[in-house]
Regions:
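Periplasm-facing N-terminal accessory domains of Gram-negative outer-membrane beta-barrel systems
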Residues: 4-7, 14-121, 125, 175
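Transmembrane beta-barrel strands of outer-membrane/channel proteins
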Residues: 113, 219-225, 265-269, 321-325, ...
């Protein structure tokens, strides 16, 4: 027995020794300051052919199981010179750590072209990801608001109803930086990495530039006014409403101590005279319906200041500290669509953010990164009156803004620690994140009260406004309101007015303590192993744990799995076709705003009274009298059995390198959401009986919602000489049942219908840049998409709970001529609707309508002039990249992104695609939003009792203020940029 054990131990020892002596190559890539450089391309050429790798989030690379012999290693990263080492003898496990240097733009472009058009079995090199370098960024807007919307469009529907999650240098929640300070953007990269809580198909990672060791910078001014814009086709006035934007920006970077520390500084200022668009119907002084088609000035200002320090503590430790302050003010908020100008108020916002990241290269196998962020934001609302509001469903809302002196102060902090360890064919990554949020909110919303008028029925009136005996017709809300005012002038009582079809349907008012506070903490832990099973096969195995306070669901452990197989890769031969598959579960957080509402409207902190068929219009009762009369309230309640919303997602796809300059990726993505948050009234009367024995409206927030999405995405990428192209096409089908309040709170299955965000069937995004004569370039950015589903409702409240989501019955076989009566409404596009269907009748599905498609072209034309003395490239002009901004690249399960370098020397304005090596550059640019002036309409009004049913009341929007509530359809900006 002892001999057997001895032989077994000896065998294992020999096997371990043989394994340990198997030739391999690994190392860490850094910039001149010692900061890590993820996403660098590593090319290995030697016995058996050529292999390619990409450094992971911690700047590490690994080539396991090599043949013994001499190799040539070439390493290149965006913004760096190409490193090359020949005759490297690899006969055992070998370590090669490399420090890259800054070099010329020409080399950078070659590296970008190679990285964007080759395929790899690395987890972070999925072909379905969009990687936007300086060339691609040049096609996008300089305005941070417009840029954010463009990035959201590129993220696609995989992001979910809350939109894509944006990480800036690994931090989530801070404001978007200026485009001039952005080094790279990665969208939908490494989608199943357990480093992240949210699905990767819908993740945007923004990596900012570090400082440099010589002074560089740029400044720009952008201008626009109404003379260069085109009116919204919905605006009826013949003249353009006033508009002006003045946009200034500054970016400076330079040394603090050579090869030790550097700084960068960003500043922005925007002064914009924008307009809100009111499209409603109210009554004239003589009680005649009139259309309100009006532009209302909404001036706004925005200021941003952001310094950054990159410091090399020693050869193995780097520190980056960044501070950002933003301030904005805007007037006449709350105005637009049905909301008349009397509802306007002024708003201010300020945000202070400090971020610190420390990276330690413990040894060639182990890297640790620690990040911390603290953010304080303050919002304030002032102005307007506290007059009671009048809400006429589907027509208009007027009255006072009722904001008083409201506002919210929020403190948010986040701490993250991540370690990466490479061993043989394995790259292990583990770490965790803790976040905390506390807020104090002051609100006097609806302290002045609101009268609501809805549609109904009543006798037909003759020309003298006298009732015609024996008649009954359907009345819209505006007519009910008109009759109320008319009959009050004639001295009729409330009962008489209601008999003739008038009278307010509902009165609501809030009272109590204006200020409410709430806090929340959540934690996430993860572990991952990227196992290089073979040179052309990588298996990623990981898990993540999530938990948050106020939700008693503490067992949220989710597996993450990914596989990448280079089908035609053999031995050291690089694959040109990579098959990818992955699966995982992703937990979402229930927002603090949801808990805040429940704390505010719990019947104690604030009281929200609701009175149906009030007889006192237009007089407003006091809250004291309502409390004394034990009037019913609307309560917000959190379910005791809340669970964390989760999304199960799976993906299979193929990345194919077509030739040296073209690549295409095809992916199928399936998602299933469970335990999604929804709200419903659990005290709706059943056969006239209230389940809780009183008439209080109890809105229960529960996690019982479901969703399902299937998506096919095709992503091409072309990089040929000076021409490049990126984008995607997606075909998407999606359904859910948790959008808004249900029509029947006891029949949630009836809510299963098309999703407003996931059932946009066709999406097409394309960005490119085309060189023109005279050193000019033109950069189109195109977004096409089919129509968005929208809900069709009756505009009525058959459940008497103040919720207007009831859907009609579509009566088949009834012609327009026969579709008449008290409850019937005919719409040519759909047919005959019964807005008050009998019990048990089949109503239409939620989101039964389909809005119009949209087509938007953004066009940028630019020309750069260079002057001053010729500047030679300095191989030592490295940037102090600091630690790799987490949230970039994701590589091999990691959050790190390209951290070092910055733009090449020469002062070329980033994104302009031109670098002469001269000291100074001047660039003149013209940017056109919706260049073709194509009208893109929003989804139509879906209220059957509204005079606007089937009519779009606003533009669909596009990027920034063009579209949506804006009064302009096309906007043309002029920009002058100076670089040095």
């Amino acid at each position: 027995m002892k001999r057997t054990l001895y032989l077994l131990a000896l065998s294992l020892s020999l096997l371990a020794e043989l394994s340990a002596q198997t030739p391999s190559l690994h190392g860490v890539v850094t910039d001149p300051s010692g900061a890590l450089v993820p996403a660098a391309t590593v090319q290995l050429r030697g016995p058996g052919g050529e292999q390619h790798k990409t450094t992971d989030g911690s700047g590490q690379y690994s080539f396991p199981s090599l043949r013994p012999g001499k190799y040539t290693v070439r390493i290149a990263g965006k913004g760096f010179a190409i490193f090359e080492k020949t005759e490297l003898d690899v006969t055992a496990p070998t370590v090669l750590d490399v420090q890259l240097q800054i070099q010329t733009e020409a080399q950078v472009l070659n590296v970008e072209a190679d990285a964007n058009t080759t395929v790899s079995s690395d987890p972070d090199s999925n072909g379905g990801a969009l990687v936007l370098g300086q060339k691609e960024l040049a096609t996008l807007s300089d305005d941070p608001d417009e840029l954010s919307q463009q990035l959201q469009a590129m993220a696609g529907p995989g992001a979910g109803p809350n939109g894509a999650q944006i990480y800036i240098d690994g931090f989530n929640g801070s404001s978007l930086p200026s485009k001039s300070s952005i080094r790279e953007i990665r969208i939908n990269s490494n989608p199943f990495s357990p480093v992240y809580d949210r699905p990767g198909f819908g993740r945007i990672e923004i990596l900012t530039k570090p400082g440099m060791d010589s002074l560089h910078g740029q400044a720009f001014v952008q201008y626009n006014n109404e003379d260069f814009n085109s009116r919204s086709p919905l605006l009826e006035q013949s003249t353009r409403p006033p508009y002006k934007q003045e946009f200034f920006g500054l970016n400076v970077t330079g040394p603090v101590k050579k090869n030790k520390a550097s700084f960068s500084f960003d500043a922005q200022r925007r002064n914009t005279t924008e307009n809100a668009f009111i499209y409603a119907t109210d009554l004239s002084a003589s009680l005649v319906p009139q259309t309100v088609n009006q532009a209302v000035l909404t001036p706004l200002t925005f200021t941003m200041l952001s310094p950054r320090l990159d410091y090399a503590l020693n050869a193995n430790n780097t520190l980056t500290v960044r501070y950002q302050n933003t301030r904005s003010s805007s007037d006449n908020q709350g105005v637009g669509s049905f909301n008349l100008s009397t509802l306007g108020y002024n708003a201010t916002t300020s945000e202070n953010t400090i971020q610190a990241t420390e990276t330690s290269i413990i040894n060639t196998h182990l890297v640790n990164e620690t990040r911390f962020q603290f953010m304080r934001s303050t919002t304030g609302m002032t102005g307007g009156t506290n007059d009671a509001d009048i809400s006429v469903q589907g027509a208009f809302t007027s009255g006072g803004a009722q904001v008083g002196n409201s506002g919210t102060r929020t403190n948010e902090w986040e701490g993250t620690n991540t370690s990466t360890f490479t061993h043989g064919t394995h790259t292990f990554k583990w770490g965790g994140r803790v976040r905390g949020t506390s807020l104090s909110s002051t609100s006097v919303a609806n302290f002045g009260g609101t009268f609501t008028f809805t549609g109904g029925d009543g006798p037909e009136l003759d020309a003298n406004n006298d009732p015609i005996a024996g008649t009954s017709i359907e009345l819209d809300a505006l007519e009910v309101y008109r009759r109320t005012l008319l009959l009050q002038q004639e001295g009729l009582s409330d009962a008489q007015i209601r008999a003739l079809g008038g009278g307010a349907y509902m009165f609501s008012i809030a009272a109590g303590m204006p200020t409410t506070s709430a806090s929340m903490t959540d934690v996430g832990l993860f572990v991952n192993d990227d196992w290089r099973v073979r040179p052309n096969l990588t298996l990623s195995l990981g898990a993540r744990y999530e938990a948050q306070t106020s939700v008693g669901d503490y067992g949220d452990i989710t597996p993450r799995l990914g596989i990448a197989w280079g089908i035609d890769g053999k031995g050291s031969k690089a694959a040109k076709t990579v098959l990818r598959a992955g699966a995982g579960a992703f937990y979402d957080r229930i927002t603090q705003a949801t808990f805040l509402q429940a704390l505010r409207y719990n019947g104690v902190t604030q009281q929200s009274y609701v009175i149906f068929n009030p007889s006192f219009f237009p007089n407003v009762p006091t809250a004291t009298s309502l409390a004394a009369g034990l009037q019913p309230q609307q309560l917000q309640i959190m379910d005791n059995s809340l669970r964390s919303p989760r999304n199960y997602q799976a993906n299979v796809g193929v990345d194919r390198q077509i030739n040296s300059f073209a690549r295409i990726s095809v992916n199928y993505i399936a998602s299933r959401g469970v335990h999604l948050l929804r709200s419903r009234n659990i005290n709706d009367p059943v056969d006239g009986v209230y389940p809780f024995g009183d008439s209080e409206i109890r809105l229960l927030n529960e996690t019982t919602g479901l969703s399902r999405t299937n998506q096919l995405m095709v992503s091409p990428n072309i990089n040929y000489k000076k021409l490049f192209l990126f984008g995607f096409y997606s075909l998407s089908y999606g359904k859910d049942d948790n959008e808004g309040q249900p029509a029947d709170p006891y029949n949630l299955r009836a809510e299963w219908g098309p999703s407003t965000f996931a059932d946009v069937r066709h999406r097409f995004v394309l960005g490119t840049s085309i060189p023109l004569p005279l050193k000019a370039s033109i950069s189109p950015f195109i977004v096409l998409q089919s129509g968005t589903p929208y809900n069709i409702t009756t505009g009525l409240d058959p459940n008497d709970d103040g919720i207007f989501t009831a859907r009609p019955e579509l009566v088949t076989g009834v012609t327009a001529a026969n579709c008449s009566g008290a409850n019937l409404v005919y719409e040519a596009k759909f047919g005959c609707f019964n807005v008050n269907p009998p019990a048990g009748a089949a109503t239409i599905e939620r989101n039964y309508g389909r809005g119009p498609g949209s087509a938007t072209l953004m066009l940028r034309l630019s020309r750069t002039w260079a002057f001053g003395e010729k500047r030679e490239s300095d191989p030592n002009a490295g940037g102090f990249g600091g630690p790799p901004p987490g949230g970039g690249g994701g590589g091999r399960g990691g959050p790190g992104g390209p951290g070092g370098g910055g733009p090449p020397p020469g002062g070329a304005p980033p994104g302009m695609g031109f670098n002469s090596g001269r000291r100074y550059t001047v660039t003149l640019g013209v940017n056109a939003m919706n260049a073709l002036n194509h009208p893109n309409y929003a989804a139509p009004n879906g209220d059957l009792t509204s005079p606007f049913f089937g009519i779009s009341q606003s533009l669909a929007g596009g990027f920034g203020p063009v579209g949506g509530a804006s009064t302009y359809n096309r906007k043309i900006d002029f920009q002058l940029r100076f670089g040095f």
